């Protein structure tokens, strides 16, 4: 029987790029806590002993960015130079400017308003041009692709084991990767390969200690959650042989460099825009969240088994310049019917998305590690299937 393989990866909160994401979103959340209408584009770079936070903001809030950065680093677990980073002693530099007034005028007085529209939702334009994708499928209960779902489960379990102290030699940096075998009907049938790489203290025996420990406490508990054959699975733990130097000492980290990890693990297309550090007026974030909401409701409504949605915006304009759906031949009604139903049930103007999903809240830090989609977390409204019934009814009129 012909089969194919598909692979997705995840990273832990201690990965350098995720440290940067965590700081950017912690600063954003702090601003939204004091001023829910803050506009922010916060970028972070971390390297050996150093953090730099830069970007543009418009806010009435006062936040101590250096203190937030240090606190977030310590929360992740970098509290000693022996781990490659220490939030208490690292240098933190801040270079934050005001948002460009040229951009701001397009967000607060959109193209439609300037051309006569009196609709309040038309007054908020997109914070940038761009295209965003959303995806859902029936491979998992969360309607996420199986490879990324399992990869995230492994990375979150690895962090849990470390933070609970079950394996006191583990350090914060880590990565996971899962390869799934699909049959000729494009259904997942087996786990082919699992890779777990974790930073650790020096002197730990990989074969005698670390591999069996991670198999017992990380890999096996995660595999038990999935009804999938794994008897012939290959397991690779720290395949370089050791992983002592990690975190920003091993690699510099930048905000927005794990966009595939943050979304669908490569199973769906990506418009290129990152999430962390951006308030929801940035459609890179709010548009992508809305597309997941739409795609998940299409699948939950039984209109398709797989659904990828694309939306596109012009900077300063409220109404999307493009929208399309691809169901990869799994649709149960014509795709044109699904697109029409989505247009009737969902309002994809930025102001409507922000209001409908209640995005002006400090909810973003919790999403930094483990993905922005498929999560059952407080305030993650884009995972609701609250419009599936309306979609189904509209599509079948």
UniProtKB/Swiss-Prot annotation:
Residues annotated as binding Mg(2+): 17
EC number: 2.5.1.6
Cofactor note: Binds 2 divalent ions per subunit.
GO terms under cellular component: cytoplasm
Source organism, top-level taxon: Bacteria
Region (Flexible loop): 99-109
GO molecular function, one term: methionine adenosyltransferase activity
Keyword Mitochondrion: no
Biological or metabolic pathway of the protein: Amino-acid biosynthesis; S-adenosyl-L-methionine biosynthesis; S-adenosyl-L-methionine from L-methionine: step 1/1
Transmembrane segments: none
Subcellular localization, as worded in the UniProt entry: Cytoplasm
Function: Catalyzes the formation of S-adenosylmethionine (AdoMet) from methionine and ATP. The overall synthetic reaction is composed of two sequential steps, AdoMet formation and the subsequent tripolyphosphate hydrolysis which occurs prior to release of AdoMet from the enzyme.
Oligomeric and partner information: Homotetramer; dimer of dimers.
PANTHER family: S-ADENOSYLMETHIONINE SYNTHETASE
UniProt similarity note: Belongs to the AdoMet synthase family.
Name of the featured protein: S-adenosylmethionine synthase
Organism: Cutibacterium acnes (strain DSM 16379 / KPA171202) (Propionibacterium acnes)
GN (gene name): metK
């Amino acid at each position: 029987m012909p089969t194919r393989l598909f692979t997705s990866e995840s990273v832990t909160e201690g990965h350098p790029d995720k440290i940067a994401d965590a700081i950017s979103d912690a600063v954003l959340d702090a601003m939204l806590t004091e001023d829910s209408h803050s506009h922010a584009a916060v970028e972070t770079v971390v390297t050996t002993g150093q953090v730099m936070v830069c970007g543009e903001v418009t806010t009435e809030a006062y936040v101590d960015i250096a203190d937030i950065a240090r606190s977030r680093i310590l929360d992740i677990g970098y509290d000693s130079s022996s781990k490659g980073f220490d939030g208490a002693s690292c240098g933190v530099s801040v270079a934050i400017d005001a948002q460009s007034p040229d951009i701001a005028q397009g967000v607060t007085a959109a193209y439609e308003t300037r051309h006569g529209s009196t609709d309040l939702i038309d007054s908020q334009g997109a914070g940038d041009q761009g295209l965003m994708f959303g995806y859902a499928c029936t491979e998992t209960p969360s309607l996420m692709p199986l490879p990324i779902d399992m990869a995230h489960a492994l990375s979150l379990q690895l962090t849990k084991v470390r933070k609970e102290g079950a394996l006191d030699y583990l350090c914060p940096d880590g990565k996971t990767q899962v390869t799934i075998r699909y049959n000729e009907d494009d259904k997942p049938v087996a786990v082919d390969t699992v890779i777990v790489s974790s930073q650790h203290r020096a002197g730990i025996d990989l074969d005698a200690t670390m591999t069996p420990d991670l198999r017992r406490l990380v890999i096996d508990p995660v595999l038990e959650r999935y009804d999938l054959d794994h008897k012939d699975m290959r397991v690779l733990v720290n395949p370089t042989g050791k992983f002592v130097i990690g975190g920003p000492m091993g690699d510099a980290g930048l905000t927005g460099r794990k966009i595939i990890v943050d979304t669908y693990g490569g199973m769906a297309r990506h418009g290129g825009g990152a999430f962390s550090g951006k308030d929801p007026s940035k459609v890179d974030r709010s548009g992508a969240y809305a597309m997941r909401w739409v795609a998940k409701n299409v699948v939950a409504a039984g209109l398709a088994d797989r659904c990828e949605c694309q939306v596109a915006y012009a900077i300063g304009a409220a109404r999307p310049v493009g929208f399309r759906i691809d169901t990869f031949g799994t649709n149960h009604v014509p795709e044109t019917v699904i697109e029409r139903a989505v247009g009737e049930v969902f309002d994809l103007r930025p102001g409507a998305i922000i209001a409908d999903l209640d995005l002006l809240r400090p909810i973003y830090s919790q999403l930094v590690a483990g993905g922005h989609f498929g999560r059952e977390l407080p305030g993650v409204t884009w995972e609701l299937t609250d419009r599936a019934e309306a979609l189904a009814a509209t599509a079948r009129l």
